[in-house]
A protein has these predicted regions:
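Catalytic glycan-binding domains that act on GlcNAc-containing polysaccharides
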Residues: 23-173
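Bacterial N-terminal signal peptides that target proteins for export
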Residues: 1-10
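Bacterial N-terminal signal peptides
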Residues: 9-18
């Protein structure tokens, strides 16, 4: 259950984020990382893995099941989250595409939930994409390795340079 205070923080963020924001902070990796105690470079590595830093990215997920889902925006927020985001915070699918900053905040929130559930480890990061099911272990490991490779590459660079360029949608290799 999400605490009352967290709902207030998210509501205030949504109100403030509806105002136009500068290009330098358009994707809010640093701010979202601070809010959810996640390294902004890790968020950037996830965004690179998920969407190649494309805020308009939309993908259909079939994953071998009859039920398909949709991933949208920089952090490729999955449609399984849409009802909760809409009912609890008033965030629509269109908001996640139109507001890259909001998309990053939601992605950071989802990652923070994984970390809270399973600890600070690569399984939690892999679960961002593949979930915690035993059936998705192979996909989780592959995904975590992709994020890890981007993350290690980003750690070797100047942190502020990486964050500034990611905020402009520039992939850093």
């Amino acid at each position: 259950m999400i605490s009352y205070h967290l709902k207030i923080v998210i509501f205030l963020f949504l109100v403030s984020s509806s105002v136009a924001f500068s290009n330098a902070h358009a994707f809010c990796f640093k701010e979202a990382g601070e809010r959810y105690s996640v390294d902004p470079l890790l968020l950037i590595a996830i965004a690179q893995t998920e969407s190649s830093l494309n805020p308009q990215a939309t993908n259909i997920n079939r994953r071998g099941t009859a039920k398909e889902s949709i991933d949208i925006g920089l952090m490729q927020i999955n449609s399984v989250w849409f009802n909760q985001l809409s009912s609890e915070w008033g965030i629509s699918k269109q908001d996640l595409i139109k507001n890259p900053c909001q998309n990053v905040y939601v992605g950071a929130y989802i990652l923070a939930l994984n970390i809270k559930k399973n600890g600070v480890n690569w399984k939690s990061i892999g679960a961002y994409n593949a979930g915690f099911s035993d059936k998705t272990e192979a996909a989780r490991i592959i995904y975590a390795k992709k994020v890890y490779n981007f993350y290690v590459s980003l750690l070797a660079k100047n942190r502020e340079f990486v964050i500034a360029n990611a905020s402009k949608g520039v992939m850093i290799k």
